UniProtKB/Swiss-Prot annotation:
One of its GO terms (cellular component) is cytoplasm. It is an enzyme of class 2 (transferase). Its EC number is 2.5.1.6. It holds the Pfam family S-AdoMet_synt_C. The gene is metK. This is S-adenosylmethionine synthase. Belongs to the AdoMet synthase family. Binds 2 divalent ions per subunit. Binds 1 potassium ion per subunit. The keyword Chaperone does not apply. K(+) binds at E43.
């Protein structure tokens, strides 16, 4: 029987790029609490002892950006100079500009050539869903996220007191080529920052027993499964001291772990007038409902936009041969049941809420949090009825 391997990775909330993402989204949420129609493109850089806040923000909100950055760093767990990064001692610089009026006139309703709310930029976005896990996400990325979430949980509750905030996970699965479904886990990689007083053997055993085994389905682990725990042997220096972190540099971790294409636009720090974020969320919503409705076992949707224009320039669906009805019919159903204009997406998914901080670590998709409206499957009955299923 033919098999193939596929790998996805995740990173913890203490990874420097994720620190940057979380600061950007914390600032976005703080602004949306006071001004839900603000235009926000908040970028963050973190390095040893330094945080730089830059980008474009147009708002009536009165927000203490520097305070929010420090509070976010503290919540993540960088609260001691021994960790190489400390919310108290790091320098924070805020250098925001306002949104360009040339862009604003294309996005604001009643302005520009298209009087509807236009897209904030050109671009292409993808949504994806499959039946590999209960949340209709690919197996490797779903469980890679759960591993680093578990690492953070055990770090914060003190069960493994030598854990530090920075961590990465990676899962390689063996897939059945005939069914396209995962059969077993081939390799698990977990690297976690740690205090200098823990030896590698003790750390490795604890990580496998307390982090890896409670998370991964036991039926997917075989005697041949390889566990690579801190394979360099030491990971004391980490976080922003180990690497410079930037907003938007973990776009594959944020989405489908490489199982679906990515249009290239990052999410964190962007208000929902930016289709990089809102249309990617809508794409997930569409794809998940199509799979949940049984129209296909796998669904990938691409949407594209032109700056200042409300209607998408294209909508394409690929079901990889798993469809129960023709793809052309699925595209018709998408156009009928989902409003993919920027304003339509914002209303459909209620995106003007301060809900983005929670998205900034452990994946934007496949987490059935109450705020994550794009994970709802409330279009299933309508889709099935129109599809004749």
């Amino acid at each position: 029987m033919s098999e193939y391997l596929f790998t996805s990775e995740s990173v913890s909330e203490g990874h420097p790029d994720k620190v940057a993402d979380q600061i950007s989204d914390a600032i976005l949420d703080a602004i949306l609490r006071e001004d839900k129609h603000a235009r926000v493109a908040a970028e963050t850089l973190v390095n040893t002892g330094l945080v730089v806040l830059a980008g474009e923000i147009t708002t009536t909100a009165n927000v203490d950006y520097i305070k929010i950055a420090r509070e976010t760093i503290k919540r993540i767990g960088y609260d001691d100079s021994e960790l190489g990064f400390d919310f108290r001692g790091c320098a924070v610089m805020a250098c925001y500009d306002k949104q360009s009026p040339d862009i604003a006139q294309g996005v604001n309703e009643g302005e520009g050539l298209d009087l509807n709310q236009g897209a904030g930029d050109q671009g292409l976005m993808f949504g994806y869903a499959c039946d590999e896990t209960p949340t209709l996400m690919p197996f490797p990325i779903y469980y890679a996220h759960r591993l680093v979430q578990r690492q953070a949980e055990l770090r914060k509750d003190g069960r493994l007191p030598w854990l530090r905030p920075d961590a990465k996970s990676q899962i390689t699965c063996v897939y059945d080529a005939a069914t396209g479904l995962p059969k077993r886990i081939d390799t698990v990689v977990l690297s976690t920052q740690h205090s200098p007083d823990i030896d590698h053997k003790t750390l490795s055993e604890a990580v496998i027993e307390d982090i890896v085994k409670p998370v991964l389905p036991p039926e997917m682990i075989t005697p041949e499964t390889k566990f690579l725990i801190n394979p360099t042997g030491r990971f004391v220096i980490g976080g922003p001291m180990g690497d410079c972190g930037l907003t938007g540099r973990k776009i594959i971790v944020d989405t489908y772990g490489g199982a679906a294409p990515h249009g290239g636009g990052a999410f964190s720090g962007k208000d929902p007038s930016k289709v990089d974020r809102s249309a990617a969320y809508a794409g997930r919503y569409v794809a998940k409902n199509i799979v949940a409705a049984g129209l296909a076992r796998q669904c990938q949707i691409q949407v594209s936009y032109a700056i200042g224009v409300a209607e998408p320039t294209s909508i394409a669906v690929d079901t990889f041969g798993t469809n129960k009805i023709p793809n052309e019919k699925i595209v018709e159903l998408v156009k009928k049941h989902f409003d993919l204009r920027p304003k339509g997406i914002i209303q459909m998914l209620d995106l003007l809420r301060p809900i983005y901080g929670k998205t900034a670590a452990y994946g934007h998709f496949g987490r059935e949090e109450p705020e994550f409206s794009w994970e709802r499957t409330d279009k299933v009955e309508a889709l099935r009825a129109d599809a004749g299923l």
